[in-house]
Amino acid sequence: MVWSRGQRRKLALENPSMQNSEISEQLGCQWKSLREADKRPFLEEAQRLKIL
């Protein structure tokens, strides 16, 4: 969620005609392609927010 919020806005601005479902699909592909090291800060932030 933490990663996708910022990415969703960026993708929507870059592709104004893209449907929300298409954006979600694209975000899923992008997330899966990230290395674990690149995902780690977002996963840690999500965990921190979950505790609050």
UniProtKB/Swiss-Prot annotation:
Interacts with CALM, EP300, HDAC3, KPNB1, ZNF208 isoform KRAB-O, PARP1, SLC9A3R2 and WT1. The interaction with EP300 modulates its DNA-binding activity. The interaction with KPNB1 is sensitive to dissociation by Ran in the GTP-bound form. Interaction with PARP1 impaired its DNA-binding activity. The keyword Protein biosynthesis does not apply. SUPFAM superfamilies: HMG-box. It comes from Akodon azarae (Azara's grass mouse). Residues 1-52 bind DNA. GO terms for biological process: cell differentiation; sex differentiation. The gene is SRY. Keywords: Activator, Calmodulin-binding, Cytoplasm, Differentiation, DNA-binding, Nucleus, Repressor, Sexual differentiation, Transcription, Transcription regulation. This is Sex-determining region Y protein. Belongs to the SRY family. Transcriptional regulator that controls a genetic switch in male development. It is necessary and sufficient for initiating male sex determination by directing the development of supporting cell precursors (pre-Sertoli cells) as Sertoli rather than granulosa cells. Involved in different aspects of gene regulation including promoter activation or repression. Binds to the DNA consensus sequence 5'-[AT]AACAA[AT]-3'. SRY HMG box recognizes DNA by partial intercalation in the minor groove and promotes DNA bending. Also involved in pre-mRNA splicing. GO terms for molecular function: calmodulin binding; DNA-binding transcription activator activity, RNA polymerase II-specific; RNA polymerase II cis-regulatory region sequence-specific DNA binding. The keyword Transmembrane helix does not apply. Pfam families: HMG_box. The lineage of its organism: Eukaryota, Metazoa, Chordata, Craniata, Vertebrata. Signal peptide: none annotated. GO terms for cellular component: cytoplasm; nuclear speck; nucleus. Gene3D superfamilies: High mobility group box domain (1.10.30.10). It is found in: Nucleus speckle; Cytoplasm; Nucleus. Its main location: nucleus. InterPro entries: HMG_box_dom, HMG_box_dom_sf, SRY-related_HMG-box_TF-like.
